[in-house]
Amino acid sequence: MPDFFSFINSVLWGSVMIYLLFGAGCWFTFRTGFVQFRYIRQFGKSLKNSIHPQPGGLTSFQSLCTSLAARVGSGNLAGVALAITAGGPGAVFWMWVAAFIGMATSFAECSLAQLYKERDVNGQFRGGPAWYMARGLGMRWMGVLFAVFLLIAYGIIFSGVQANAVARALSFSFDFPPLVTGIILAVFTLLAITRGLHGVARLMQGFVPLMAIIWVLTSLVICVMNIGQLPHVIWSIFESAFGWQEAAGGAAGYTLSQAITNGFQRSMFSNEAGMGSTPNAAAAAASWPPHPAAQGIVQMIGIFIDTLVICTASAMLILLAGNGTTYMPLEGIQLIQKAMRVLMGSWGAEFVTLVVILFAFSSIVANYIYAENNLFFLRLNNPKAIWCLRICTFATVIGGTLLSLPLMWQLADIIMACMAITNLTAILLLSPVVHTIASDYLRQRKLGVRPVFDPLRYPDIGRQLSPDAWDDVSQE
């Protein structure tokens, strides 16, 4: 069975996904007028606006923190370690490339989710890829297919991956039994997810910034302490990225395809650009200024923080301690624990364990929120279905601590590809709408007015929208 999963992954990620992700990212970069570069200087202002409260939804900052909670999981630690061991230091460079290109894709999918959102019976905004497939494309069947993929991925597999990382970290540092880890983590997860969307969002708006700051500041201090090695580390990234590094002295050599494949894989698992997960959080926000593009820009910040800041910090720590092959017998999170012991002494692994617990717990909780959101699209938002999903998540967290790491990641990669292919197909078909959103936002900014989306200006789009999603702002 592992060989079968490995074959499927090699087909999907050896060619199909790389070309699709790269092509979609380049296409949306062009169609949006290089949106990730145009507004990068506005990230600070966008963050300031994101705390502006609006009725009927989360603040943009709460939405960003919820999406970051899902992004900033063990993929930022274990995933980076796996990328370096499988693709060499050059995989880090291709993670950066994938992140910059992915910003445009994220802008597109999150803007569409915000545009096609609707209110549930409680007045809370709901939306995501399933909604823009149904409303924007008129293909509800496609939305149902995507929602099922997401329920499998976020309700089951990805939470197991995160739990696996916690179990391995605790076992490596304290020889803690994986089953006990799974039970304790599952109980805390159940307590958190019963708080609902708003409760989780309030929890994450304080939790996520704190844990990110702890990890990044620690990494910066270690980099400063080892500043003499940084030029060599940075050169090794670029040298390996383009296949210049030859196998010599018994060390493993890495091909260009290995670096690109692993860089794109791990970048996508970490920042989720194009996968269709983040739009579920983006749609829940009452955007400020009241324009779909404003939420798209806020969610681009999430990719910047996730990959270009947090993942880079993890990569630097691993490469400062060795070249990624030094601890080849170790897998994933254990590799970065070993690296931190080299850099920080005996308590380095224990520190990583604490960070992994924080990252993975927040990711598991946010993963559940995404899955529950899609129950609403499938019209299964009744107490029985919701509790069934909660029990599945509870069981998956326990089960994930007992499975092997390679098998968990292979399953994650396959379902991630299925989600991405479905979502990217939809947003590429909706690219004229993305172009309209981006152009309308830019037009109003050039006029010096606060961007406000008016569906009456675009009647073809307006007819596709939920009648109560944008009526209020169109009259401002």
UniProtKB/Swiss-Prot annotation:
Places the protein is found: Cell inner membrane
Single GO cellular component term: plasma membrane
Coiled coil: none
Transmembrane stretches, start-end: 4-24, 81-101, 141-161, 174-194, 207-227, 233-253, 300-320, 351-371, 391-411, 414-434
Membrane topology: Multi-pass membrane protein
GO molecular function: amino acid:sodium symporter activity
Keywords: Cell inner membrane, Cell membrane, Membrane, Symport, Transmembrane, Transmembrane helix, Transport
InterPro entries: Na/Ala_symport
PROSITE patterns: NA_ALANINE_SYMP (PS00873)
Entry keyword Nucleotide-binding: no
PANTHER family: AGSS FAMILY TRANSPORTER, SODIUM-ALANINE, AMINO-ACID CARRIER PROTEIN ALST
NCBIfam families from the UniProt entry: agcS
Family per similarity comment: Belongs to the alanine or glycine:cation symporter (AGCS) (TC 2.A.25) family.
Protein name, UniProt field: Uncharacterized transporter YaaJ
UniProt gene name: yaaJ
